[in-house]
């Protein structure tokens, strides 16, 4: 019985220490548990979306600027080069 009580007391102390540490982290970072990760994830997702939009806009602008659909200008360059070698 004595050993069982000691292990229960140790477990309770360990749990209290974990709670204190997590509470200290919350105060240190200024966010409730897990909130900081969520905010970081949301900002990364927003950055990825913005980058995708920029890439789409850039490729669309190139198409309009050069007047050819994607890859068509390269094919047109290749054809005269192939005709010269024949």
From Swiss-Prot:
Report which superkingdom the organism of origin falls in. Eukaryota
Provide the positions where the record notes the PTM Serine amide: 33, 70
Summed up, the tissue specificity of this protein is: Expressed by the skin glands.
Q: Where is this region: Disordered?
A: 1-86
Which residues fall in a compositionally biased region of kind Acidic residues?
Answer: 8-17, 44-55
| Residue numbers carrying D-alanine (Ala) | 28, 65
Q: Which UniProt keywords apply?
A: Amidation, Amphibian defense peptide, Cleavage on pair of basic residues, D-amino acid, Endorphin, Opioid peptide, Repeat, Secreted
What the protein does?
A: Dermorphin has a very potent opiate-like activity. It has high affinity and selectivity for mu-type opioid receptors.
**Name assigned to this protein:** Dermorphin peptides
Species of origin: Agalychnis annae (Blue-sided leaf frog)
